Amino acid sequence: MMTKTNLKMGARTLALSVLATLVLSASALAKIEEGKLVIWINGDKGYNGLAQVGEKFEKDTGVNVTVEHPDKL
C-alpha cells in the first residue's frame, strides 16, 4: 500500500512540475520568431564580444541575430 501512495505523490509532483514549467516558460516562448535569434545578456557580461559572435553567425547562416540587454530583467 505504501508503494501506491508514493506513486500517487510522485505523479502529482510531476504533474505540478510540468504545469509550473509551462506557466513560467510561456512568456519566453511568446517572443520566438522564425529566422531570428535573440540573445539576452547583462550589459556587463561580455556584451560586445557576444555581439561580434552574433554578427559572424548571421553572416555565415543568414539568420538574423540580435543581442540585447533588457533593463527590465
Curated annotation (Swiss-Prot):
Main location, first listed in the record: periplasm
Compartment(s) where it occurs, according to its Swiss-Prot or TrEMBL record: Periplasm
Signal peptide span: 1-30
Gene3D superfamilies: Albumin-binding domain
Entry GO CC: periplasmic space
Highest taxon in the source lineage: Bacteria
Keywords: Periplasm, Signal, Sugar transport, Transport
Function: Involved in the high-affinity maltose membrane transport system. Initial receptor for the active transport of and chemotaxis toward maltooligosaccharides.
Family: Belongs to the bacterial solute-binding protein 1 family.
Protein's name according to its UniProt entry: Maltose-binding periplasmic protein
